[in-house]
Design a protein with these regions (language model features):
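Residue-level hotspots within well-ordered secondary structure
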Residues: 32-168
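Extracellular calcium-associated, cysteine-rich motifs in secreted modular proteins
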Residues: 1-33
Length: 168
């Protein structure tokens, strides 16, 4: 009974009260996934920055993290997340995260290899409590914002987006 409704999952699926679109026997609302979405613009590295999930999507393991690659080496950036997805021009790129926005401090330095990382902490604000609390079964949208002085223009760009549904 992954969704805690006191009905066996197989019975939920058979009764049609839970969907199982992929036919794996687990109700869709109980599955976790990370899907990249939204288009990023090329930055001064010549490539668009890409965001990825690292570790496990199971909150209980405490290993979930974020990684952005193809970023301008030596710059600084900030991972952030929100309650919905959008697609709108923003600085030198596109904003992919909307709704209520939560920043993940501290800022992340981009290494010489063009990679920035952030290890999630589900025990502190904003991920651990309040409006930005991440809990099993919740879906959030992540993106990486970074300085890009050599690119000119607004001197700021963003990665693509990452939609994550965390495991119960």
């Amino acid at each position: 009974d992954c969704n805690g409704n006191a009905i066996l999952d197989i019975c939920d699926i058979a009764a049609g009260t839970s969907l199982d679109d992929n036919g794996n026997g687990t109700p869709d609302e109980c599955e976790c996934f990370a899907t990249e979405y939204c288009t990023a613009s090329a930055n001064s590295s010549g490539l668009p920055a890409q965001i990825h999930a690292t570790g496990s999507l199971d909150i209980g393991t405490g290993t979930f993290g974020l990684l952005a690659d193809d970023c301008p080496p030596g710059a600084m950036g900030l991972f952030y997340y929100g309650t919905s997805s959008v697609y709108m021009p923003f600085y030198n790129g596109f904003r992919c995260v909307g709704g209520n926005i939560f920043r993940l401090f501290p800022a992340s330095p981009i290494g010489g290899n063009g990679v920035a990382t952030h290890q999630a902490d589900f025990n502190t604000t904003p991920m651990g409590s309040g409006a930005g609390a991440v809990y099993p079964g919740s879906t959030w949208y992540f993106q990486f914002w970074f300085r890009d002085h050599p690119a000119g223009g607004w001197e700021v760009n963003l990665s693509n987006g990452l939609e994550v549904t965390f495991c119960p």
